[in-house]
């Protein structure tokens, strides 16, 4: 199995992966596995119990959303599954909006960001009135 629109593998946790969680939340949701290499092989994590506590709190505090964090085991190696549901409202990471596209995380900027926010808030450009010319 390869990384795809809804699956990302990381060998260990870094706080920057909150951007990936943000991207999944703004797209169709997905799962991040901590303790798996780029080939999808379980390599395990040594601090699984700490991650089970830290990750949900960091996601809540930084992104304002809730994700499921589960401890899994394969061949005696523990790894973490972070299950991110899609959110209908735009989710940002420190003022930046990320989006999962294919097997990549994209930061939305400019016209793409405007379009994304308008779509998520149910608005259209033609309903905005310019008051001065």
Locate each region found by the language model.
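Conserved N-terminal catalytic/coupling substructures associated with nucleotide/phosphate chemistry
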Residues: 1-133
């Amino acid at each position: 199995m390869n990384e795809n629109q809804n699956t990302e593998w990381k060998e260990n946790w870094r706080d920057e992966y909150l951007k990936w969680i943000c991207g999944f939340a703004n797209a169709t949701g997905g799962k991040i596995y901590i303790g798996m290499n780029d080939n999808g092989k379980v390599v395990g994590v040594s601090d699984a119990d700490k991650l089970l506590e830290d990750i949900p709190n960091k996601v809540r505090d930084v992104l304002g959303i809730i994700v499921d964090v589960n401890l899994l085991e394969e061949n005696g190696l523990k790894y973490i599954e972070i299950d991110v549901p899609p959110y209908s409202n735009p989710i940002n990471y420190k003022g930046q909006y990320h989006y999962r596209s294919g097997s990549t995380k994209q930061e939305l900027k400019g016209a793409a960001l405007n379009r994304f926010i308008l779509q998520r808030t149910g608005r259209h450009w033609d309903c905005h009135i310019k008051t001065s010319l």
